[in-house]
Amino acid sequence: MQCRSIVHRLYSKVSHVTTPIFYPNAKPHLGHLYSSLLSDVYHRWQLFKGNLSFFTTGTDEHGLKIQCASESNGFDQPKKFVDKLYPEFVQLDKIYGINYTRFIRTTDPDHIENVMKLWELCLKNGYIYMGEHKGWYSISDETFYPESKVIKDPKNDGKYLNTESKNEVVYQSETNYFFRLSLFNKKIVDHIRKNPDFIFPASKRDQILKELETGGTLPDLSISRPSARLKWGIPTPNDPSQKVYVWFDALCNYLSSIGGIPSILSNATEVVSRHYSDKSNVKGQLLIPYPKEVQRNTIHVIGKDIAKFHTVYWPSFLLAAGLPLPRQIVVHGHWLCNGMKMSKSLGNVVDPIDMARYYGADIVRWFLLENSKLEEDGDFQEAKLYETRELLVSKWGNLINRCCGSKFNIERAVMKFSDKANFQFQEIFQNEPIVSERIENLAKLLNKSQEVFDEKIAIFQYPQLLRHVWSIINDANTLVQNSKPWERELDQQDNIIFLAMETSRILSILCQSIIPSLSQSFLDRIDVSKEKRTINYARLGSDKTYGKQSNKKGREVPLKKIPFRLQEEQTNMRS
């Protein structure tokens, strides 16, 4: 009992955050990136605090959708098709600094073993049986829809659509294995009621609860497909005539990536690799201590279109297998483009890699995190992305550039004021209460910032967090602009420069989870040493050694102005 208590204390700070695994049947898009960014910031922040954190992403490579896409693209084997496409998702993650600990593919051998194990446990515990399935199936969604959610296609006579995704459905009758989902209604509802943060935000939790409590008993779920129809999938254990349903397969990745079901059940330490194909590389290996605790502290970050699979099916599979439930499922909206759904036919699909190459990956990271709410769909507007970059240049970049001018001496200011007790500066501006008040307020905001970051990141409220960052940057710029340090005697000048540079230093340290590359450039520009970029130095006056060469002429600015991409393209076309 004492041992269990020690384990709980040791790993109460462990976290495992996941994105959905993505279909590699087309190029990665903004929605893929957004899920990854939400997860990446959370993961980076946990590491920044010194906590143990794991982060899983990857590709969902089985199923009829992949099989059909492979055939239509002229591949004789689906594996060759996904082998060609999955690197594009790895590339997206690399460009945007997505710091995952495991990129899992559902074709990885260790994952296939875990799918088999999950099936065997559910079967052994009496939750899987063979039956006949009749219903409306969507290839695009890889799921069946009830009659109540099927309508005639108004544009194509003889075809039918489902009312949820608006994708085509076809009527099928076949023999499948079924999962006894009907036994889990009350268990799932009870768990959500006892753990109100299990589904977040609250609006999505309430929606799921309403569906579970008013929709009647859940129908049992078909969890296999005939091998004659679905050739590309994991065979069901001991029955090659059936393939495992793609969602039963895909959801299991969250267990495979933290050591697998046997390790979770025994809570035994396991070694996993960042990429299974590179498992012999010791540098890419990661130790997963106490996998059961890691599973209990898992947060799934998902899009609203797959909420049912994660909030109803997945907990039911885990309960049936005797495995711990995750801590939380965070559901976010989708991304539009200029108020319209993105589609190839409209020609408005945003390529996140193109955006990163022109504007910079960290600019796109900031823009997406600032202009989104979990409860709503985001609206991508390239003009607004450009405006975000301009603001970072003119406000944060310019704050650094002005204070690094030859008229000032950052090193002297830091040495003079970093030791001031409680940072009470009123005596320096005795006859200027407005300046004194601005300095005091800025100092308080900076010392409070670490707590604000912790609070907002814990609940994925990134827009609120970035508003806090902007308010501090604006206050620092106002202080410099209105107090005119270039016209003052040295003590007053150094006091103002110290506060302005502490603003940039502290925010750059804290924003490493949000803009990992740009924050390093800002810190490099004011000569903050690499070892002093940790959470221990994100307090006023905690670094007394930076700024030594910052006021030398000829230093490169960390962020420069660029023209609007579409405007530059038009100019190039005319020339």
Curated annotation (Swiss-Prot):
Enzyme category, top tier: ligase
Residues spanning the signal sequence: none
Keywords for this protein: Aminoacyl-tRNA synthetase, ATP-binding, Ligase, Mitochondrion, Nucleotide-binding, Protein biosynthesis
Gene3D superfamilies registered for this protein in UniProt: 2.170.220.10, HUPs, Isoleucyl-tRNA Synthetase, Domain 1
Primary localisation category: mitochondrion
Motif ('KMSKS' region): 341-345
Subcellular compartments: Mitochondrion matrix
Pfam families to which the protein is assigned, alphabetical: tRNA-synt_1g
EC number: 6.1.1.10
GO cellular component, one term: mitochondrial matrix
Domain of life, per lineage: Eukaryota
SUPFAM superfamilies found in the cross-reference section: Anticodon-binding domain of a subclass of class I aminoacyl-tRNA synthetases, Nucleotidylyl transferase
Keyword Phosphoprotein: no
Family: Belongs to the class-I aminoacyl-tRNA synthetase family.
Function of the protein: Catalyzes the attachment of methionine to tRNA(Met) in the mitochondrion.
Name used for this protein in its record: Methionine--tRNA ligase, mitochondrial
Protein encoded by which gene: MSM1
